[in-house]
Structures are given as structure tokens and as C-alpha cells.
């Protein structure tokens, strides 16, 4: 049921107005489409809107739980410098008055940046706030169009027909838990990082943190300031100590949990703990999307998709912005949005459905040949020097290199690809995340590169369209 798009404006729905949805709305409007954004909350910002509220189930497995969509903890700071985080024509620079001036600012500064972006490009005029999308499905009258059913916070329901739907609902709301034998009988308290806000509940406790990626590292050190002991369970064990924290230890993965409150690690170490914090990531989740099986989620692979964006059988009527994780997220949202907008207008053509499917299947086969698990399908970065993918060879980078991906999309839609300075700054920054120690955000030696970056920023004109 692949749609045939001729060159004209389309009526497009965008679901979710976080960093992906905001730039999607802008790029769709720039391409001449009429756009309506659906946002369940009162404000733009998505992931970056902090709240003290958490799910009613601390590990978020109860299907009937009260769901809170924010996963931000109070102490969160960015793990990339602001200079490489922003959209191409709207630099994320220090605000002149209020805000956090640090290069690795806190979440409030990122939210203010997104709010400034929405204001600058008058995006809020196209948003229906406090409106939850309940169902997206082919229109019964015309299966080349899409029916969107929604409900506002005051209980009023409605539906509308669109030529296309762009899904930007993020992937940091539905927690994923690792399988740990015996965990169901372990007597201590458990929480997923989705529901972590402050360290106070762990005062004087022995805490095990499962996972050592960005949130795991942040939460471990946050809790270490107040807990008796913190033990990190990590797949990437380099040493058993961590930075300047005497009460923090690193262990390999967990072998099993026991009813007596102990946890056994794979190196034989046994720890009696009061609490476990699961920093084990999230699942892609689209409860509103009804595609009759044309799009599925299996072990965190959303597929089949052409270039992480278009389901071949439904393209271009359905598209996804922001599925790949890691990498330069805001820039990726922007360039994917340019591609989707230009495809919908007919300015850029997609291959035939069978060709897109062939390429998707070939991509999945390549990942399988390399031994890359399905859950890393949307991992978009250069694996060289990245311990998450430390077993892969440099020549495998072509499979998942974000630079190649950005360059390919830029060529399709005739826009500027990733700037050399942004790529260089990211490559330096991502190594610091893994190898820079617990104070990497406040130590850097890239002054010369930053001078180059700000010279490039100075060339931008206000409200400049960098796609032209």
C-alpha cells in the first residue's frame, strides 16, 4: 500500500513535540506542507521536561501503572558539549542572561534552548497541546491516507484524516529490564532509572546499579554522595574502582539474585544490597500505531525500515524521526526531517517498495553476519574506539557510521551534511564519555576547535535556512 506522492503540499501530523518533533514541524512547513503537531503535555520539550512525578510502579512493568513520560533526573547534565548539540542554523550557545553557562549544561538549559527554537520559528502555533494520540491507522475511505484519533486533557475526543504521519514520540518512556535469575524473589527495593530523580531515598544504603552507560554512570555517582556503598554491574569492566569515590565499586554482570538479599556477580563476588537501580535502557513503543503487522518491534528493532525512517510498505505515509540512538541526536532529527519533508512534497523520490525492502533485509543480514544483536540495529555512531562495540573491527563502521548516514541523506535531499567541526567535536567528546573519568564534563583542551566553531556560528544569519 505504498503511497504515490506527487509534487504538492501535504496535510501532515507530527506526533510528539520534543527535540525531534519540533524540527520536523519546522522542516515540513519549510517544504510547504500544512502541519499539526500533537503533544500530550502542556509544553514542548518532550524528554527534556523535568518533573518530580514518577510511574506508580517503580520498575514500570505493571501494564496498569500510572505512566509519567519524563525520564530526567534532577542532576542530569548533557554528555556532549552544547556546541555540537544544536540544530544546524540555531546554535546552542550560552544565553546572555539566565541559564546554565557551562559547556555541558543541565537539562533546564536544553529545555530553554528548545523553547527558544519553538518561539523563533513560531512552531507552537501548529501544536495541539495536552492532546494524546490514541490511534493511527489507514483511513477506511482511502488507505493512502491516515486516520488519527486523539483525546484532549478535558476528555474531548476527535479524529482527523492526514496525508502522512511523522512519528516523533521518542524512546525513553517504556523501560527495558535485563533478565536476572532470581530477581523476582529478591527482597530489596528496585527502581528503573526512568523513575530515578534524586539520591535521597538511598541514604546510607548499599545500592547496586545495573548498567554503566551515561545514565548508569551519572546515577551511580549521584547516589555515591549519600549511600553507604554503590556497586555498578557493567559489561565493560576495566577496574574495580571508580574515580574519586571510595564507596563505589565496579563488577561484571550479575549471575543471580537470591532470596536472602544477596546478589552474586559473575566473578563470584557477593554483595548484600538494600536496593537495585536498573539503568538498562528502554524499549521502542508505539501503542497508537496500527499497521496490520507492516511495522513491528522485535528485540528493539523497529522494522522493516528503509534507512531507519520509512517502512517500505507504508512509505511515505508513515515515517519515523529519531529512532537511531547515540550519535548527534539533534542534527540527526533535523536531517531526517529534511528528507521526510522533501519526499512528501515529491521533490525527492524514494525507491520502489521492493527495492527499499531488499535494502532493509540486506542491512539486517549484514548486522547478523557481523554478530551485532538486533537491539543494536538503530545504533548510529562510529564504533571505532567505542567500548559499547569494542569487538567490532574498524572496517565494520560502514554499517552504522553516522557520518556516512548523514552524508547519504544530505545527498538525497540536496541539503548540507554534517559540518567537519561538528564531527570532530563529537568524536573527541564521545571518547571523553567513556574514558574521561567522572569529571569529564568540566575538563577539556579543545580551545582551538571551539574558536573555529564560534567563527562558523558567527556566519549564520538569524532564522537562516541552511537547507538552501
Swiss-Prot record:
Cofactor names: FAD
Signal peptide as annotated in the record: none
Keyword field: FAD, Flavoprotein, Monooxygenase, NADP, Oxidoreductase
A Pfam family matched in the record: FMO-like
Binding residues annotated for FAD, in chain numbering: 16-21
Residues engaged in binding NADP(+): 211-216
Function: Catalyzes the conversion of methylthioalkyl glucosinolates of any chain length into methylsulfinylalkyl glucosinolates.
Protein's recorded name: Flavin-containing monooxygenase FMO GS-OX-like 1
Claim: Cytoplasm is one of the keywords in the record: no
Organism the protein comes from: Arabidopsis thaliana
Gene3D superfamilies in the cross-refs: FAD/NAD(P)-binding domain
InterPro entries: FAD/NAD-bd_sf (IPR036188), Flavin_mOase (IPR000960), Flavin_mOase-like (IPR020946), FMO-like (IPR050346)
E.C. no: 1.8.-.-
Similarity comment: Belongs to the FMO family.
MF GO annotations: flavin adenine dinucleotide binding; N,N-dimethylaniline monooxygenase activity; NADP binding
Coiled coil: none
Biological process per Gene Ontology, one example term: glucosinolate biosynthetic process
Top-rank EC class of the record's enzyme: oxidoreductase
Keyword NADP: yes
